[in-house]
């Protein structure tokens, strides 16, 4: 019983530590553009049947006398995708998504492969070659792939539908996608998300 009590207390401390880790991460990213905060749920371990082993005063069969729990465990760490605040800037390349959806970008993984990722962070800029990139230098995707704009253009506008107009000429449209079920997208760091098997993309 004493060991069981210690174990139950230990599970509570582990659960509380995970909750504090999640809160600390949310606070550290309070000013991160496009960041979605996380929360953690808790649940009890499955209850075990408690049995009184027969002794001289009991009948031959062991007797069930109730159930007991062995403490608490982390149930799920989940992301809150509700709309965050939107701040205006003077840059025509600073964008924000109102409602659901993600910008599509490409990046390079540890194997050197080009992979697709998704982000809510719309703080974009142009490289010296005119590619539209995010704050990490990953290329933003349009309907035709990488978006390239004349870096010397005098007038760049992006309307509410994601259509990019450069000096009066439509160049491309941002590839903005959404997913039927957010349980199939995972955070990968640097404010990016990836999809897992089963994800259904919508546009």
Provide a role label for each language-model segment.
Residues 1-203:
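Amphipathic alpha-helical polymerization modules
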């Amino acid at each position: 019983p004493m060991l069981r009590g210690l174990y139950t207390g230990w599970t509570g401390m582990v659960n509380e530590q995970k909750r504090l880790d999640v809160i600390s991460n949310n606070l550290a990213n309070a000013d991160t553009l496009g960041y979605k905060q996380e929360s953690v749920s808790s649940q009890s371990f499955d209850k075990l049947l408690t049995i009184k082993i027969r002794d001289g005063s009991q009948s031959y069969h062991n007797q069930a006398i109730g159930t007991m729990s062995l403490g608490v465990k982390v149930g799920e760490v989940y992301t809150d995708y509700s709309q965050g605040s939107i701040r205006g800037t003077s840059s025509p390349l600073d964008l924000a998504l109102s409602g659901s959806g993600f910008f599509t970008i490409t990046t390079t993984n540890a194997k050197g492969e080009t992979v697709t990722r998704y982000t809510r962070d719309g703080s974009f800029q142009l490289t010296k070659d005119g590619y539209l990139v995010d704050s990490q230098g990953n290329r933003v995707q349009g309907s035709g792939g990488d978006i390239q704009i004349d870096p010397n253009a005098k007038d760049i506008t992006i309307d509410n539908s994601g259509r990019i107009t450069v000096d009066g000429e439509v160049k491309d449209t941002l590839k903005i996608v959404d997913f039927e079920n957010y349980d199939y997208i995972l955070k990968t760091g640097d404010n990016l998300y990836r999809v897992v098997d089963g994800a259904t993309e919508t546009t």
